[in-house]
UniProtKB/Swiss-Prot annotation:
Family: Belongs to the YbaB/EbfC family.
Region (Disordered): 1-26
Organism: Shouchella clausii (strain KSM-K16) (Alkalihalobacillus clausii)
Role, per record: Binds to DNA and alters its conformation. May be involved in regulation of gene expression, nucleoid organization and DNA protection.
Keywords: Cytoplasm, DNA-binding
Protein name (Swiss-Prot/TrEMBL): Nucleoid-associated protein ABC0038
Subunit structure: Homodimer.
């Protein structure tokens, strides 16, 4: 490979890296929402996998059935994190297509 081609390739990689870093920063500002149990529990998460809110309907708060509430919170949280993964793939997938880097995103 010629030095000129190698230099161009390095410039392209640096440009792509900057674009990817910008996209990662933008992900922090995006949110996803997951609702389970017919609206009983809603979890809102950021694009960098931080749980921002957990909203629980008063109807589901039953001191005699705490386990159901726990299950709904877990289900909503897992669904929100799944949606974040989909958002990350949508926003950053264009940078990793064709690269074989398992577990990177």
């Amino acid at each position: 490979m010629e030095m000129k081609n190698m230099g161009n390739m390095m410039k392209q990689m640096q440009k792509m890296q900057k674009q990817m870093m910008k996209a990662q920063e933008e992900l922090k500002e995006k949110t996803v929402e997951a609702t389970v149990g017919g609206g009983m529990v809603t979890v809102i998460a950021s694009g960098d996998k931080r749980i921002l809110e957990v909203n629980i309907s008063e109807d589901v708060v039953d001191p005699d059935d705490v386990e159901m509430l726990q299950d709904l919170i877990i289900a909503a949280t897992n669904e929100a994190l799944k949606k974040v993964d989909e958002l990350v793939e949508q926003d950053l997938g264009k940078f990793t297509k064709g690269l074989n880097m398992p577990g990177m995103f």
